[in-house]
Amino acid sequence: MKMELKVKPIENGTVIDHISGSKALKVYKILNIEEKLPMTIALNVPSKKGVMKDILKIEGLELTKEDVNKIALISPDATINIIKEGIVIKKFKVDLPKRIDGIIKCTNPNCITNKENIDGKFSIEQKNTLKIRCEYCEKFINSIIISK
């Protein structure tokens, strides 16, 4: 017997779709979403492309440009849907900017940003297989630590 889960559409807010499988909770965490906001988190849902995806629906949330950049770092294929009065008024794919300031922490313990209270500045050197370089110490980082 095939079971289907019905999730009520949101009236006003944001739907983050096509999140890489098992990454919705990481997206939720980096966005610092208020716990009082109604939301639906769907994990490992089959997509039309045959791969697993996650979906995050948050009633009453408007994303900032910084939020979208954070999502792009974690799930570069994610799609953002802005909902007003039950209608999708804007839909777009996230896109990594050429430079990211202040939201990533350098993993090099000798970097000046880790010794003093300085926000990190990073260049996106390669998007398809994420390659990020610290503009202070020039180190390429493999693991992303979101600082804000």
From Swiss-Prot:
SUPFAM superfamilies the record matches: Aspartate carbamoyltransferase, Regulatory-chain, C-terminal domain, Aspartate carbamoyltransferase, Regulatory-chain, N-terminal domain
Note on how the cofactor is bound: Binds 1 zinc ion per subunit.
Swiss-Prot/TrEMBL keywords: Metal-binding, Pyrimidine biosynthesis, Zinc
UniProt xrefs under InterPro entries: Asp_carbamoyltransf_reg_N (IPR020545), Asp_carbamoylTrfase_reg (IPR002801), Asp_carbamoyltrfase_reg_C (IPR020542), Asp_carbatrfase_reg_C_sf (IPR036792), Asp_carbatrfase_reg_N_sf (IPR036793)
GO BP terms in the entry: 'de novo' pyrimidine nucleobase biosynthetic process; pyrimidine nucleotide biosynthetic process
GO CC annotations, alphabetized: aspartate carbamoyltransferase complex
Gene3D superfamilies per UniProt: Aspartate carbamoyltransferase regulatory subunit, C-terminal domain, Aspartate carbamoyltransferase regulatory subunit, N-terminal domain
Record GO terms (molecular function): metal ion binding
Cofactor(s) recorded in Swiss-Prot or TrEMBL: Zn(2+)
Keyword Metal-binding attributed: yes
Binding-site list for Zn(2+): C106, C111, C134, C137
Subunit structure: Contains catalytic and regulatory chains.
Family: Belongs to the PyrI family.
Function text: Involved in allosteric regulation of aspartate carbamoyltransferase.
Protein name: Aspartate carbamoyltransferase regulatory chain
Species assigned in the record: Methanococcus maripaludis (strain C7 / ATCC BAA-1331)
